[in-house]
C-alpha cells in the first residue's frame, strides 16, 4: 500500500492527466472548426495518450490497494489566437505537467518507494518526448508561418500521426 502522501499526490496527478486530456480534446475541436483535420488529429492522439496516462496511474493505485479519487475536472480553454499559439500553449502545458511529474518522482524517492519511482520514471521519459513534439511543431510553424500553403502542408503531415495505446497495467514493463 502507498503512503497517504503518495496516494494524495497520485490522485492529484490522475486529475491533471484527465484535465490534460480534456484540454487536448478542446484543442482538437478548435482545429477541426478551422478546417485543420491534421492538427485536430494530432491533438486527438494527445487526448487519447493523456487518457492512457490517467488510467495507468489509476491501475497502479488499485494494484497497491489504494483508493482512487476522481475529482471534478476544471474547465479548459476553448479558443486560441492562432495555430502557433495553440502549440505554444501545448508546450507551456507540457512544461507544467513535467514539473508535476518531477514533484511526484521526488516524493516517491524521498519516501524510498522504489516501485512508484520506477512507474514515475516512465512518465519522466514520456515528458521529454511530449515537450520535444510540441517544440518541433512550434519550430515548423515559425519556419513556414501558420497560414497558407505551409500550414496546409504541416496539417497534412500531422494527419499521419497514429494513436498507439500504451500498456495501462503495471505488470511487466512500464512500456
Place the predicted regions along the sequence by residue.
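Iron-associated oxidoreductase/ferritin-like identity signal
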Residues: 1-175
Amino acid at each position: 500500500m502507498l503512503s497517504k502522501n503518495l496516494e494524495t499526490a497520485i490522485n492529484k496527478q490522475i486529475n491533471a492527466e484527465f484535465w490534460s486530456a480534456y484540454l487536448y480534446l478542446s484543442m482538437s475541436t478548435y482545429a477541426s472548426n478551422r478546417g485543420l483535420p491534421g492538427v485536430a488529429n494530432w491533438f486527438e492522439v494527445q487526448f487519447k495518450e493523456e487518457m492512457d496516462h490517467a488510467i495507468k496511474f489509476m491501475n497502479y493505485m488499485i494494484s497497491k490497494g489504494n483508493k482512487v479519487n476522481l475529482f471534478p475536472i476544471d474547465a479548459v480553454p476553448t479558443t486560441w489566437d492562432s495555430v502557433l499559439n495553440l502549440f505554444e500553449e501545448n508546450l507551456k502545458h507540457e512544461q507544467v505537467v513535467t514539473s508535476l511529474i518531477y514533484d511526484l518522482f521526488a516524493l516517491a524517492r524521498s519516501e524510498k518507494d522504489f516501485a512508484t519511482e520506477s512507474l514515475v520514471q516512465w512518465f519522466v521519459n514520456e515528458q521529454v518526448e511530449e515537450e520535444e513534439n510540441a517544440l518541433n511543431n512550434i519550430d515548423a510553424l515559425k519556419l513556414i508561418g501558420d497560414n497558407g500553403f505551409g500550414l496546409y502542408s504541416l496539417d497534412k503531415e500531422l494527419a499521419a500521426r497514429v494513436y498507439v495505446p500504451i500498456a495501462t497495467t503495471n505488470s511487466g514493463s512500464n512500456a
